[in-house]
Amino acid sequence: MQVVAGVDLGGTAINYTLVNGKEQFLIEGLFEYPARSKEGPDICLQQIEDGLKGAVEKAGVLLTDVVAVGLDTPGPASADGVLSAEGSTNFVHTGWGGFDIRGTLAKRLGKPATYLNDGNAGALWGHFAIFGANHRQTSISAIVGTGLGGGVIIDGNVVKGRKGFGGELGHVLIPYQSIPGTSGMKPACNCGRMGDLESMCSLTAIENTLLPFFLAKYPNHELGKIGDIHKAAKLVRGLAENCDPMCQDIFRVQARALGLFFDEMVNTFDPDALIVGGGAVETNEKFQRWFIDEIRAGMPTQREEQADIPVHVMPNGDTAGARGAAIQALQFARENHLGHLSTSGA
């Protein structure tokens, strides 16, 4: 049975999956291996190789059955997988600067390799989960985590952009002043913008802006007594799930910000689906429904023809990167007639 592999390289762990020509994932849940990325390219790439051997064994296939490998990493990087010369939070070792991680991995494995940044990989997985690998629909994904990632899928293909920065949705400016209850709020993003989506909808937004703002309105709240805003920010979602009024206000503002953003995307792309993923929605079903309802409440009135656009919650969020990377590799293998990976056979 011939397969493709998906490799999601994070800061501390590598997650793997494999998928066959019937679009069946052969690993359920996480299969992780230590990344050791802070020790530089040579050690990290060896870790990727070693972990892949374990993944194929778990899936019950051979390494020779893998016809292509999809890789995703945090950015910034070019569309072809050349990491930024300035490095990043996850690639602090000087050896990573300007490093061609996709090309080098392909040479080491002796197999073709594709590349996506982690946000685009997650978006491709969300698209596949709804439409399948070969359908030509358009979707917009917003992945709410420490920052705000995501991607744009048009006709089934990831929009990478000229320099690999396509789908940097977190830095789209939104008219946040129209969100009820935010008068006087000054959401500053780490990128230098004021009022982009990430500054209103992310864990960083909760820590830097939303929690301090709402603690001023709820001066006796238990989170204000912790004395550590970083620790307190991580507790907001759990309290919101349990109907804490202040924490629900915080998540309501985040949802309304997403509604404004999605409205812009509807007017720009007229997509078939909107998808939200990440830690904000890795919760119970009741809270997910409430959050989606608040997103819709934040969207201005749509044209009658567009008013029924679905808003989906991305499934299997912890494996989204590896699965999206694998789907990219599967598309590449099919387009280049590698192996026997048509939808009619494995």
Predicted features, each with a name:
Residues 4-8, 65-70, 139-143, 149, ...:
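Short glycine-aspartate micro-motif
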Residues 187, 193-273, 309:
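A mobile "lid/hinge" subdomain adjacent to the ATP/sugar-phosphate binding pocket shared
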